Amino acid sequence: MSRAAELVSVLEATDSLAIVCHDNPDPDCLASALALEAIARDHDVEEVTIAYGGEISHQQNRAFVNLLEISLRTLSRTAIEEYDSVSFVDHTRPGANTEVPADVTPDIVVDHHPGESVDAAFEDVRDEYGATATIFIEYLQELEVDLTTRLASALLFALHRERLDFVREPTRREYEAALAVYPDADLEILEQLYGSAFSPGTLDAIGRAIASRERRGSSLVASVGKTGETDALPQAADYLLNLEGVDTVLVYGVVGDAIRLSGRSIDPRVHMGETLAEGFDELGAVGGHHDMAGGRIELGLFADDDDDDGALLEFVGGRLTRRFFDALNLDD
């Protein structure tokens, strides 16, 4: 039985499905959720809810939700225990990068990030793929689910934002998947999405990252300072990769009560996920791919409530920078 057929066998025993996106969902996660919703409805699942934790702060991601009219519900307003089945898309582990408690076992998991098995009834994790959307496009093709303009547009944009717009190792599968959905996509919507990339807050954060950058060889560390926009960190990291001679970037910043990390690398010798794990695993939750990774460290490890923001960032920055360069074996 194919993986798509196995997925259908689980859905056919389900009347209600909660599709859980990871915190602060990006287009790959959201488009994958839409694809699973389409497959579920095509196989007579009566109630489908797409839920997420965190916030959608990235201007482009907000435009993605609004232009494609994606119906979402926050996890705080979703009683997932009342659904027959719970699905994770673009993430695998409860309690990690999701507000879902660690003691909840999902019934369906589809992801392209490496991770430990969670004993779901259906689990399809392909870390050799460049995007979760690619996996769902293969499902849609095999199951002959009607591809609406809305879904095709969402999937095509997700493929571009996750892989095809970057040097970060898109696989042949991403190009083939893009060709499959391209004829049904609305290119005007994609143009509008590309025109909504940066909010003023994100531009300010990128400016702080540029000003604070510290470089050793082809590697660079920068701070966005204190920001309310989690998505500003990966955007700043992507931007700094454009600096001549730089191939590896770590951006950090304080978001709420945590220090957020976002790493990017186009150096084939650097595994960013392993590098962050080596440098920061004992401090918080970190991990990711060969070319992109992230993490979250509780601010309480470094600070008291009364600490001055500027002094705190200087204190934290020095330690994070040293740990990152040490993990890359880069001397002063």
Protein language model annotation of sequence segments:
Residues 26, 36, 65, 111, ...:
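Divalent metal-coordination and catalytic microenvironments
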Residues 16-75:
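Anionic-ligand anchoring segments at beta-strand to alpha-helix junctions in alpha/beta enzyme folds, i.e.
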Residues 1-4, 10, 29-32, 162:
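Secretory targeting signatures
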Residues 70-119:
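Active-site cofactor/cluster-binding pocket
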Residues 163-234, 242, 246-247:
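Glycine-rich, Lys/Arg-enriched anion-binding loops that position phosphate/diphosphate groups
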Residues 51, 87, 106-110, 123-125, ...:
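Hydrophobic/aromatic beta-strand patches that form the interior of the parallel beta-sheet core
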Residues 5, 12-17, 22, 30, ...:
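Gly/His-enriched, cation/cofactor- and phosphate-binding structural elements
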Residues 110-178:
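Short alpha-helices
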